[in-house]
Amino acid sequence: MHSMISSVDVKSEVPVGLEPISPLDLRTDLRMMVPMVDPIMREKQLQQELLLIQQQQQIQKQLLIAEFQKQHENLTRQHQAQLQEHIKLQQELLAIKQQQELLEKEQKLEQQRQEQELERHRREQQLPPLRGKERGRERAVASTEVKQKLQEFLLSKSATKDSPANGKNHSVSRHPKLWYTAAHHTSLDQSSPPLSGASPPYKYTLPGSQDAKDDFPLRKTASEPNLKVRSRLKQKVTERRSSPLLRRKDGNVVSSFKKRLFEVTESSVSSSSPGSGPSSPSNGPTSSITESETSVLPSSIQAEHLVSQQRLLIQDESVNLLSLYTSPSLPNITLGLPAVQSQISASSSFKEKQKGETQTLRPGVALAGQYGGNLPPSSTHPHVALEGKPNSSHQALLQHLLLKEQMRQQKLLVTGAVPLHPQSPLAAKERGSPGVRAAHKLPRHRPLNRTQSAPLPQSTLAQLVIQQQHQQFLEKQKQYQQQIHMNKMLSKSIEQLKQPGSHLEEAEEELNGDHSMQEERAPASSASIRAESSSAGEDDRIGQQVGAVKVKEEPPDSDEDTQTQQMESGEQAAFVQQVIGKDLAPGFVIKVII
């Protein structure tokens, strides 16, 4: 606007009558001739020119805006068209890519199908010769051996039916499992040669006694390779069963002396009938089970077995400790057990006692690999409580350990000296004198007997030890409660005696009556120490102050509690002296009856 105004000012200086195109007149004469224009007219002209210029500017603005809008619309249209074209191109590219991927997948699938078809063709080409070879092998195996074995089995079966020894076969049929366990040393291979001319090359019993799994020779479709495989499997099973690692599952303690006894007894029993094979199991050790009513081993044979068993226990160094398992897979712990010499001496004493008891033994059931019968509990040892089981080694272990503990306790009570080895933690801990207890407080190292270790058998021994500990604890608790009760009653009686006006004559009469009653009851001895004290009566006279305290002690039943009761009597005497030393009322009397 300032530029326009300046231009208007410039134009106002030019005279109106003159045209702008006309050349300027520089003459001064003419100017003097032109009359002067009025200022009012000049202002009007200027205003008109300003209005015209403003109108022109508005028109130009409108034109410019219209052109700008047109160009903007054109540009937006072009841009949209370009965007649409770009989107179309992208869509086309995506479609092309998808088509290419689909084509590639189809090609891969076709290739896989072709490869599978080729593999099928190759397999089909290779299978016919293999099938032919297998058929040829199956046809090449001859079944004549199977037929021969079946014929031999039928012939032997008919021969056994005709044999007169039917009772023995019936006895074996009752216990087929025992026959198999007793004769496990025989060969299980069906192709093995027979041991005698009359017996077949394999074990059998009456029909129905065996299980269905053991009847594999009767299969009509069985071939020679199948029989070989099954016989090998059976041999492996028997080897595994005979291994010492898997016998621990039965829970029985198996040792070397058992095996020796089994061999000795088997040889001695089988020597009576030398011509017997595996087909006559009545001569084995199981015949004593089925025919115990008719034919029973005499007691002298069982006594010899027991004596030989004890000799083997003493001589064999590998069976020094009866309380330990002899399996080589697990080590044994010998903590709390004595040395070898004490155990051998205890076992020898046990052997001498068993010699006297063999005359009264009842013939028990002897399983395969277990001999010795059932040992009844001896009357001289009431603490031994054995269960009625066929495991003689376990019973011998219990008796041996209990005898050892009894001998140790007797030595401690008689001599009162310190033992060679400290007591086991399961035994009674506080039965000895105070000097023995002080000696036991210091730990002593003992040389180990064996390098193997295994947990001790958790059986009746542990139960007996736990019962002993429980009884000792109950006795101590009773004694402690009795002492507390006696102290309370003494303190009460002292307080009542100090008070004036207490009636003491009736209390003295009651005490005399109680004393006479207790002297009558004295022959019937009891195991516990009773302390009775009388409370002051209500009707005693004033001026007489006479008190009485009575402590009655009776001899204990057993020699084991003598030391503890002596200590308690010493404590009671000290307590009575303390009571006497106190400032009591005049005329106070203490009566102690022992």
From Swiss-Prot:
The keyword Coiled coil does not apply. One of its GO terms (molecular function) is transcription corepressor activity. PANTHER family: HISTONE DEACETYLASE 9, HISTONE DEACETYLASE 9-RELATED. Gene3D superfamilies: 6.10.250.1550. It catalyses: N(6)-acetyl-L-lysyl-[histone] + H2O = L-lysyl-[histone] + acetate. Residues 267-288, 523-536 have a biased composition (Low complexity). It is found in: Nucleus. Homodimer. Interacts with mef2. It comes from Gallus gallus (Chicken). Belongs to the histone deacetylase family. HD type 2 subfamily. This is Histone deacetylase 9. It comes from the Eukaryota. Devoided of intrinsic deacetylase activity, promotes the deacetylation of lysine residues on the N-terminal part of the core histones (H2A, H2B, H3 and H4) by recruiting other histone deacetylases. Histone deacetylation gives a tag for epigenetic repression and plays an important role in transcriptional regulation, cell cycle progression and developmental events. Represses MEF2-dependent transcription. Its EC number is 3.5.1.98.
